[in-house]
């Protein structure tokens, strides 16, 4: 029942807002983002049209991004930020973008042309070095295929079904210098497993979700990152930039 109202709202918006209302493309940080005709919900198209889609992450990434860097994104959604980062790091850089939703991976594949330095991966992923026992048994959506989060648990002595920094390094030969995280509350894993970030990681941009674990919970999770040798240097909305000291 709780998902019924959003579904009805989306049907009404689609009926009363014609597709021609949306621009064919919008320019975000030099990247042409297709909008009209794309299988995106009203809210996503609205924020794209206003130029404010993922603006907090886009603002913070400009402070640390340079050509040639290796960037790991956890929670790629429709791939806008990954595409922007791929353009900025250039052919000598590398971007690995993980997304848990199969539908979102399909949409991002449809929206974007191939880019040699950018690889998109479907899978559950957590921002810890060793999360081999993290198991996600359910992917919960919030009434829209464009929103959702994995419900995780620890299974001691049993292998999980998720990616972590260590398995990514091993499987993809990828040791990122920048980590960007927006996994809808999955950052609360820090309460169970310390991040233990590898030395090569220099910057972390994380979107927090205090509506899930509270303001005090966010402060506690931020401290877990600081304890790994990082300083909190900037905030934008619910996104926080940490840089290694």
Question: Model regions: which residues?
Answer:
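General small-molecule cofactor/ligand-binding pocket signal
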Residues: 119-121, 233
